[in-house]
Amino acid sequence: MLISHATDVVQQRAYVQESADSIALAAVIGGQRSANALENILQVTITKLVLTENEAVVHVRVGQFTATSVASHGG
């Protein structure tokens, strides 16, 4: 039972981090609208999104799990 729970936790954490990474990439390319569209598709909550000219920083939550990701592009 413990291994099963640990596996579930790892999978949930990975999902949240992958979602944050994907949303950060979408945001740096397509802005707020793209980030929100992916948020809805992935069924996560963006708790913070900071966009600059060349960078997106996103904080995502799913249940008790949170993740942060930064994406940038050379410009």
For each feature predicted by the language model, list its residue ranges.
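Alpha-helical assembly-interface signal, strongest on the long, hydrophobic N-terminal helix that forms
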Residues: M1-N36
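Short amphipathic secondary-structure patches
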Residues: S22-G75
